[in-house]
């Protein structure tokens, strides 16, 4: 398991760097072929499409890996914070969240379920990071 853990830590660091490269194909390369993600309980979508949408919405997107939690069931929780400036509203956001990963035998992400506080995200899109409604 120690070797697997190191490989997953390396995967998480590379995944974070891929998001910061603002290259959706690089993000998708960390998933099995046809990799999917579901965000906030929504329908699954192709990771490349989800990454492309976030990169378009936040052209200066930065993702920071906050922590990794290796669970008893074999899944991994990748905790992150993303920052960026909305291309639409011009407001800056700083949103923490996490993804629950299932890792495939080949060491890539087989499935991801991502979560963040949608209400706080929406508030920041309208009013910025430090402003209140």
Language model features: what each stretch is:
Residues 7-18:
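Solvent-exposed, amphipathic alpha-helical segments
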Residues 4-6, 21-76:
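A solvent-exposed, acidic/Ser-Thr-rich amphipathic alpha-helical stretch
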Residues 110-133:
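Low-complexity, intrinsically disordered terminal/linker segments enriched in charged
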Residues 81-108, 113:
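Exposed beta-sheet edge and beta->alpha loop/turn motif
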Residues 1-6, 129-133:
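Basic/polar N-terminal segments that are highly enriched at the extreme N-terminus
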Residues 10, 60-62, 93-95:
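Short solvent-exposed loop/turn micro-motifs enriched in small/polar/acidic residues
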Residues 63, 85-89, 121-122:
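A short, acidic/glycine-rich surface segment
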């Amino acid at each position: 398991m120690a070797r697997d853990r190191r490989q997953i830590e390396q995967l998480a660091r590379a995944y974070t760097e891929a998001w910061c490269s603002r290259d959706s194909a690089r993000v998708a390369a960390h998933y099995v072929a046809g990799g999917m993600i579901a965000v906030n309980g929504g329908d699954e979508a192709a990771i490349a499409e989800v990454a492309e949408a976030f990169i378009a919405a936040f052209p200066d997107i930065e993702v920071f890996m906050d922590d990794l939690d290796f669970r008893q069931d074999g899944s991994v929780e990748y905790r992150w914070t993303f920052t960026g400036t909305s291309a639409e509203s011009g407001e800056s956001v700083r949103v923490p969240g996490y993804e629950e990963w299932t890792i495939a035998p080949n060491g890539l992400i087989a499935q991801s379920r991502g979560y963040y506080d949608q209400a706080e995200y929406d508030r920041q899109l309208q009013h910025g990071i430090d402003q209140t409604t």
